[in-house]
Amino acid sequence: MILHIPEVLSKEQLTECRNLLNKANWIDGKITAGNQAINAKNNFQLAESDPLTNYLRDIIKTALNSNPLFISAALPKHIISPFFNKYENGGNYGNHVDNSILFDMNEKKAFRTDISCSLFFTDPEEYEGGEMVIEDTFGTHEVKLPAGDLILYPSTSLHRVEPVTKGVRMVSFMWIQSMIRSAWKRSILFELDNTIQSLRVNYGEIEETLNLSIHYHKLIQEWSEL
C-alpha cells in the first residue's frame, strides 16, 4: 500500500523546520547508506550527532503520533528515529531497497523495517526534477508532494529519487516497525478501519458499525506482534 498523508506538519511546525534546515550543517549522505545503496546515493544529510537532528525528530514523531490516518495505516510499534536530507545540483538517489533491519542509535536497539516514509519540507514548485519513484506490483508511481505532506509505502519497494536539476529538495525519511508485519494484512485493517469510520460519520454507532469494530480488534489481536 502506497499512501499520501496530507498536512502531517502544521504551518507553524513546517515554518520552524524549514528555517532550521536552511541554516543547518549538511554532510555527505553516503555515511548512512547500506552496502547496496552507497554507490547510488548522492545527497546531503544532517549528522546524527547534530543537536538539531534530535530536536527535529521530536517535532516529527509528535506530529506522526497525533495523526489518525498515519496511525491507522502504519499501526506503528516503533518509529525509527527520522533522518533529514537535501538534494541540489543534480543530487539523486538511484534504485535501491531499504535495509530490512536498522539500528536506532537513540534506542540502542535494532528494529524491523516494515514501512518507509518520506516527509516533504519543500513544495514541488521550489525545485525541478527530484521525483520520488516507487515501483510495486501495480506499476511505477511518481511522488512529488506539497511541503508538510508524507508518503508511506512498504520498505520492500524498489524506489529512487530522480536528479534535482534546479532548486533544493529537503525531506525527512524514516522507517516504521509495525505491530502488523504483513503489508497485505495492514492493508486489510486500514480499509476496514476506514469503512468503520465512514459508517460512524454517516449513520452513528449502529449495530453494524459496532460489529465491524469488534472484528477489527479481533484481527488486531490475532495478527499483532508486540
UniProtKB/Swiss-Prot annotation:
Keywords of this entry: Dioxygenase, Iron, Metal-binding, Oxidoreductase, Vitamin C
- What GO biological process terms does the UniProt entry carry, in alphabetical order? DNA damage response; intracellular iron ion homeostasis
User: Could you tell me which Pfam families the record lists for this protein?
Assistant: 2OG-FeII_Oxy_3, PKHD_C
Q: Which residues bind Fe cation?
A: H96, D98, H159
Entries under InterPro entries matching the protein? Oxoglu/Fe-dep_dioxygenase_dom, PKHD_C, PKHD_hydroxylase, Pro_4_hyd_alph, Pro_4_hyd_alph_FE2OG_OXY
Q: Which SUPFAM superfamilies match?
A: Clavaminate synthase-like
Which EC number(s) are documented for this chain? 1.14.11.-
**Listed HAMAP family:** Hydroxyl_YbiX (MF_00657)
Q: What is this protein called?
A: PKHD-type hydroxylase Abu_0724
Species in which this protein is naturally found = Aliarcobacter butzleri (strain RM4018) (Arcobacter butzleri)
